[in-house]
């Protein structure tokens, strides 16, 4: 089902002229709720009887089924660091490196590394085709990260990143004031 959905999204992206889509590794589905998952910093118990090795195998198998559509359409799948097996740069890079295709790269979400964030940005930046820059004005719903966007911009410059920077606002402040502040913050950092 997820493979079919991803292929449909690749085809829709092609029809709309969108060069990349965000994909993720999925989760084990063992948390009671997303709130519970966030309380555990995105770490979720495995399904009983299965290992991370099983999970990585399923992820690889799924993406390999999507590769022909991505190549045919010229749409890159950007694997986001987003919980589950993709919670760390090492997990995302393991999938990317094992598949070893120009049609599977990374979507770097600055708000999804809850530990050693700058070291993980540095690891993932060379594979990034899209960056989702999170801001938390007014405090975040589940957590708030202090992100030094001047430092992030420097990491991306060193990796020769030339793609889009997408704002992802997750704060509680009214969007009418927070989004302009967020855009100004990002413009200052990335135009330096």
Language model features with spans:
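Active-site acidic/histidine proton-transfer and metal-coordination neighborhood
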Residues: 1-105
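Histidine-acidic metal/acid-base catalytic patches
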Residues: 17-20, 64, 72, 86-192
């Amino acid at each position: 089902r997820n493979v079919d959905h991803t292929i449909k999204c690749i085809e829709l992206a092609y029809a709309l002229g969108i060069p990349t889509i965000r994909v993720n590794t999925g989760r084990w589905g063992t948390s009671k709720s997303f709130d519970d998952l966030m309380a555990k910093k995105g770490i979720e118990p495995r399904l009983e009887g299965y290992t991370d090795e099983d999970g990585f195998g399923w992820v690889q198998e799924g993406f390999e089924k999507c590769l022909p559509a991505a190549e045919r359409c010229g749409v890159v799948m950007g694997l986001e660091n987003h919980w589950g097996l993709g919670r760390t740069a090492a997990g995302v890079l393991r999938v990317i490196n094992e598949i070893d295709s120009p049609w599977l790269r990374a979507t770097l979400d600055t708000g999804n590394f809850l530990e050693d964030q700058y070291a993980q940005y540095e690891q993932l930046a060379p594979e990034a085709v899209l960056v989702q820059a999170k801001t938390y004005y007014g405090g975040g719903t589940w957590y708030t990260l202090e992100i030094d966007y001047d430092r992030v911009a420097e990491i991306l410059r060193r990796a020769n990143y030339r793609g889009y920077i997408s704002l992802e606002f997750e704060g509680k402040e009214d969007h009418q004031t927070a989004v302009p502040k967020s855009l100004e913050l990002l413009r200052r950092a990335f135009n330096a």
